[in-house]
Amino acid sequence: MSTAETLYNDFRLENFFVGDFVSDGIIVKPNGKLIRRFKVEGQSNFKKGTLTLNERFTYDDGEVDKRVWQILCLPDGSYEGYTTDLVGPPPRNHPTENLFSWSYRLKLPVKNIPVTLRFTDMMHFHNNAISNVLSL
């Protein structure tokens, strides 16, 4: 079995996110229309069942944003995520092969007005890289 096959058959976020990471992604409307492109540069740390992701987003229009996720690694193999601008219940899901997705709501400033947005975040893991698709 190849390394990639082993990774996908026993995929764990805490084994993938080790140290520094980079990801490219897009934000799309529910109809698939592209809204923005972004790049995420981050650092990860795993301690006592919690994966911490420190993320720095750079958008194609030059805007920069930061977010820290605390992701609990639960005994049933699922993950539950927390961040400061989360609204409502935390996202929770299991990874499947090389895909991890979850839905959540964040309160974010849009033209300096706080707005609650619903996201579906799909992370595709391939060749030691990540592609993100965020759908509003």
Predicted regions and their residues:
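Glycine-rich, aromatic-bearing surface loops/beta-hairpins
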Residues: 118-136
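Amphipathic, well-ordered alpha-helical segments in soluble domains
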Residues: 17-20, 98, 126
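Solvent-exposed, flexible loop/coil residues
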Residues: 15-17, 31, 121
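Central antiparallel beta-sheet cores of small beta-barrel/beta-sandwich binding domains
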Residues: 24-112, 116-118
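N-terminal helix-cap/turn-to-beta initiation motif at the start of protein domains
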Residues: 4-20, 46
